[in-house]
Every structure is written in C-alpha cells, then in structure tokens.
Amino acid sequence: MSKKIRLIARLDVKDTNLVKGIQLEGLRKLGDPNACAKEYYEAGIDELLYIDIVASLYNRNNLSDIVRKTVDDVYIPVCVGGGLRSVEDVRHILSMGADKAAINTAAIKRPELITEVAEAFGSQCMVLSIQAKRSRTWPGKWEAYYDNGRAHSGYDVVEWAKRGVALGAGEILLTSVDNEGLQQGMDLELIEAVTKAVNVPVICGGGVGCGDDIVDAANAGADAVACAAVLHYKKETVTELKEDIRAGGVEVRQV
C-alpha cells in the first residue's frame, strides 16, 4: 500500500439539527449533530467537518455552541464552514475549538480574504471550499457555485482552485454538487482535474456510497474523502468503510 487517505465525516447543520439532502436540496432532519460527531469519533473517523448550510444566506454562523460541545468529547481535527466572512469570524470559530476554517461564499466575493486568513492563522487553517457543478456552457469543465450551490460564480473550478492556493489556501474542500447525496460514486474526472492542478491536500466529497468509491477517489488523487449519507443512513459504519478501503489497497488510519 502506498496511497493514503483520510476519512472525514461531514455534518451539515441547519439551526441546531443535523440535516442531509440530495444535490444540496430537499433537506431532511437527522438528529443531534453533537451525538453523531461523538459516535463517529468513537468509531474511528479521522476528522470532522461541520458546515452551517444556510449561514451564508442569512449572514450568520450558528455553529459556535455545537463546535464548543463537540471538542469537549472528541480529540481529532475539526473543520468548520458556513457564514465565515472575516478574519474575526475565523478567530471566533477557532476560539470555540475548531482547527480549520472552510470558506466558500466570502472567498468568491472577496478573494483577498483567503490571504488575510492564511496570514493571521497559517495556511493550514485556511481551507478553500469549492462547490462544483458540471458546466453547461464550458464542455468538460466545472463551475464554482456558492450560497449552498444556488449561485453561479462564473469561475472555472480548476482555475479557482489554483488561484485560491496562490492566495494562501492550504487545503481544498471540493464538493461535487451533481453527485452529492446520491451515493452512486464520486466525480472522478473532477477530482483528477483539481488534484493535478494544485500542490495542497484536497478533501473530496459528493457521492460516496461505499468503500470502493473512496478507493476510486484516492486513486484519482484525493487526499481525504468527506462522507455524509453513507454514514448518516447507516449504509456502512466507519469500521466497514475502513476495512473496504484497506481491501482496495489504500492505507487509512487504524481504528
């Protein structure tokens, strides 16, 4: 085994509820995000990713209390995104116990924020979140979206990823909106295009339905894979996913 992958549990939050949709739409309430975070941590997940999915629409982030409670119970990296619009917003969420900040909407609207966050807290803290959809006007390319996949940016995903890294992003969170929630496999062409274009770790999400999907993503270049529906709906456990990943010839942290 030579290729390694990190397994991340993605927890989308609306108000105080863990939610899940398909292609970022049709949200369904699933329960207490803190309880799920603790469950996945105890099962051996490598990292947690919290996203306040409506924060950018309402100019606020409601994750402070959730993050603060989570870090009392878990001892793995926690990344937080949604509604982070300034260095002060990032400072606050880090003070609650987060290790990294994922920024999408505010970075598209004001790209220099990427540099400001990287200079204030280190590039390892600045995660550029990219919501990618296959473009109808640019054959073979993807467009970056924001406001939870609702708004066009006009940015080519690969070029935006390269620009974000040049501005100081130390990691990319790449979500395929087209595949998100379907549990039918990931957009491997997208993963390969972005990972070949940048020299920082890329967390890939959207479409995981089994361990083989994660193996495919790793072989396409992903450094980490964010899982949601496959875990939330109990299709596979963290242990089962990791067993499948190892069986596919990819290294993952032992539980």
Range-by-range predicted roles:
Residues N61-R68, P111, G154-V158, Q184-E192:
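Charged helix-capping and loop-helix junction motifs
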Residues R6-R10, E47, Y75-C79, D99-A102, ...:
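Structural preference for beta-strand elements that scaffold enzyme active sites
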Residues V13-D15, V19-K20, L24, A98-L174, ...:
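Conserved anion-binding
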Residues E47-D65, T105, L173-G185:
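Glycine-rich, proline-tolerant flexible connector loops at the mouths of alpha/beta enzymes
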Residues I114-F121, V215-V255:
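C-terminal helical cap(s) of enzyme catalytic domains, especially alpha/beta-barrels
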Residues V54, N62-C125, A247-G248:
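Glycine/small-residue-rich loop that forms an oxyanion/phosphate-binding "nest" at active or ligand-binding sites
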Residues V74, V78-K100, E189-V225:
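Catalytic cores of alpha/beta
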Residues D12, Y40, L48, V80, ...:
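Conserved, mostly hydrophobic/aromatic
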